[in-house]
């Protein structure tokens, strides 16, 4: 969830009457839009496997969505997972989950109607132009939705917010956008096994350039004595809210102090060896490594239950690894990139993504590596 202490006060995607006790083995939830897209909030298809499970901390604050035929194109798909935090985190994550893809979808449709067709030749320049255009659309709507949360939202987002990690796939092009500490990891074939390629950087206060931005805006970054490895963002004159991420929707108590809503956006061309992308909230990544996640998904004979198997594995690991802790919510979307059979077993090795084009708008340069604690930051002894 990502917040230490909090102040409480579109269309909402509901995931069940108990507001969070669901998992991916339930009945599929699918609806059609008026312009050809198929929106999935639970279940599986030939392209995706989805699963969500409430943790032990209270109401489920995770949300997820998949849009097939995105923008009216049969070979185009949009996937996203969202991890809310704070008293209204469950409302904000679902609000963003519904509104972000719907606005991007409508923008693409309207651009096509106006004659601004997608560039379809294979030249490097034209594909980069497509990426830059889509990056602008994403950043615009990230900022627009965040601004609306602060101005006229029915939800108090002063100390509540959400992460977001999304993947847009068109033909052999992946555009990934990341905000916060949810993560996207690619499973790619290597002989008779898989290797895990981390596509996103966890945007946390311990990433040096993130910390530098926060400190330059008078925010504070430090770890509490009881959690020496978890750096958090604090207001200048108050030990609140203790946010464990450096970018998010909402959390307006920190927006003047270095917290931003500009996503990391980059593009990767899909190779013949690339099999699937796993999008998941930190309830998965806190207990399972990238390699373990890719191995679980790659070993599933029935792709439709891959996300469910991963969520169940994480739940068991929470119980064994952290028996005294409350398990976090988990949301997983597995996007399959092709329909060829692939290996079931074998060792998994870690690799770093090769980015085709990266965002001009992000100030984070620490792609692919586990972030180190920023120089000059210390624990808070209290």
UniProtKB/Swiss-Prot annotation:
It is an enzyme of class 3 (hydrolase). Binds 2 magnesium or manganese ions per subunit. Residues 107-126 are annotated as: Disordered. Mn(2+) 2 binds at residues 83, 282, 328. Its EC number is 3.1.3.16. One of its GO terms (molecular function) is protein serine/threonine phosphatase activity. Residues 47-337 form the PPM-type phosphatase domain. CDD domains: PP2Cc. InterPro entries: PP2C (IPR015655), PPM-type-like_dom_sf (IPR036457), PPM-type_phosphatase-like_dom (IPR001932). SUPFAM superfamilies: PP2C-like. Its cofactor is Mg(2+); Mn(2+). Mn(2+) 1 binds at residues 83-84. It catalyses: O-phospho-L-seryl-[protein] + H2O = L-seryl-[protein] + phosphate; O-phospho-L-threonyl-[protein] + H2O = L-threonyl-[protein] + phosphate. It comes from the Eukaryota. Keywords: Hydrolase, Magnesium, Manganese, Metal-binding, Protein phosphatase. Belongs to the PP2C family. This is Probable protein phosphatase 2C 65. The lineage of its organism: Eukaryota, Viridiplantae, Streptophyta, Embryophyta, Tracheophyta.
């Amino acid at each position: 969830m990502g917040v230490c202490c909090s102040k409480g006060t579109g269309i909402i995607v509901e995931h069940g009457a108990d507001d969070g006790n669901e998992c991916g083995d339930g009945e599929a939830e699918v609806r059609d839009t008026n312009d050809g897209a198929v929106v999935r909030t639970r279940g599986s298809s030939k392209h995706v496997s989805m699963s969500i499970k409430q943790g032990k901390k209270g109401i489920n604050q995770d949300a997820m969505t998949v849009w097939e035929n995105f923008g009216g194109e049969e070979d185009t798909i949009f996937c996203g997972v969202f991890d809310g935090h704070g008293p209204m985190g469950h409302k904000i994550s679902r609000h963003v989950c519904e509104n972000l893809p719907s606005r991007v979808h409508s923008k693409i449709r309207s651009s096509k109607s106006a004659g601004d067709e997608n560039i379809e030749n294979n030249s490097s320049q034209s594909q980069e132009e497509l990426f830059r255009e889509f990056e602008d659309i994403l950043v615009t709507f990230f900022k627009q939705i965040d601004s609306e949360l602060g101005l006229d939202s029915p939800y108090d987002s002063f100390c509540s917010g959400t992460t977001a990690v999304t993947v847009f796939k068109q033909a052999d092009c992946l555009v990934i956008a990341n905000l916060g500490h949810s993560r996207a990891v690619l499973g790619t074939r290597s002989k008779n096994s898989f290797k895990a390629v981390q596509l996103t950087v966890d945007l946390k206060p311990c990433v040096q350039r993130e910390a530098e931005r926060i400190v330059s805006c008078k925010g504070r970054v430090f770890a509490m004595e009881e959690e020496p490895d978890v750096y958090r963002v604090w207001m200048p004159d108050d030990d609140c809210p203790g946010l464990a991420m450096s970018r998010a929707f909402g959390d307006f108590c920190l927006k003047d102090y270095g917290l931003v809503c500009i996503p990391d956006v980059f593009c990767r061309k899909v190779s013949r060896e690339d099999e699937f992308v796993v999008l998941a909230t930190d309830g998965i990544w806190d207990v399972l490594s990238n390699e373990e996640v890719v191995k679980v998904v790659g070993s599933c004979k029935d792709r439709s239950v891959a996300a469910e198997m991963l969520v169940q594995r994480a739940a068991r690991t929470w119980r064994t690894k952290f028996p005294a802790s409350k398990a976090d919510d988990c949301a997983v979307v597995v996007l399959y990139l092709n329909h060829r059979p692939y290996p079931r077993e074998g060792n998994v090795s870690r690799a770093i993504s090769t980015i085709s084009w990266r965002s001009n708008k992000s100030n984070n340069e620490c792609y692919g590596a586990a972030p180190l604690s920023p120089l000059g930051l210390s624990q808070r002894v209290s």
